[in-house]
């Protein structure tokens, strides 16, 4: 749970900083982003938004899976059985060892949406902004690597329990 809180706070901070910089509401933040982006503050904004979107999406996926543990209303036995089976599949898919897989899927969707946006901008007569797309990719990849580092202990624990069960 600490991992989820950490990823949610980093994701929220990244999205908030990118939004504040985009709105030009904090002069010191704009100066810092201009310095970090070497005159292109939008590059840092795209990096932070790529990082924040992936981490917040992972937090929402896992939070939804954790919150849906009970049936909210009585159901017929067939629907209740279907709900229990679906819930067990969702829980298996949102175990900590699968969070990195989920982040890779979400990062891929985000990068494809960014690429589609840049292609749409290029078709509208504006230039295709390769640097901004590459910063979206870098932010998403950084989020995946960050989650992979945070989940390393869970991977190790799962590998050890699997080897005990399989008799290796």
Locate the predicted segments by residue.
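Bulky hydrophobic segments
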Residues: 1-168
């Amino acid at each position: 749970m600490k991992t989820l809180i950490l990823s949610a706070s980093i994701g929220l901070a990244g999205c908030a900083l990118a939004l504040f910089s985009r709105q030009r509401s904090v002069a010191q933040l704009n100066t810092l982003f201009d310095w970090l982006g070497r005159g292109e503050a939008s590059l840092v904004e795209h990096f932070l938004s790529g990082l924040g979107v992936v981490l917040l999406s992972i937090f929402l996926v896992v939070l939804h899976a954790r919150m849906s543990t009970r049936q909210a209303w009585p159901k017929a036995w067939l629907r209740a059985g279907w709900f229990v089976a679906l819930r067990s599949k969702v829980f298996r898919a949102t175990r900590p060892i699968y969070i990195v897989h989920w982040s890779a899927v979400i990062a891929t969707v985000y990068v494809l949406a960014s690429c589609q946006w840049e292609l749409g901008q290029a078709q509208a007569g504006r230039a295709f902004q390769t640097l901004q797309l590459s910063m979206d990719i870098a932010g998403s990849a950084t989020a995946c690597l960050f989650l992979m580092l945070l989940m390393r202990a869970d991977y190790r624990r799962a590998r050890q329990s699997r080897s005990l069960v399989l008799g290796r």
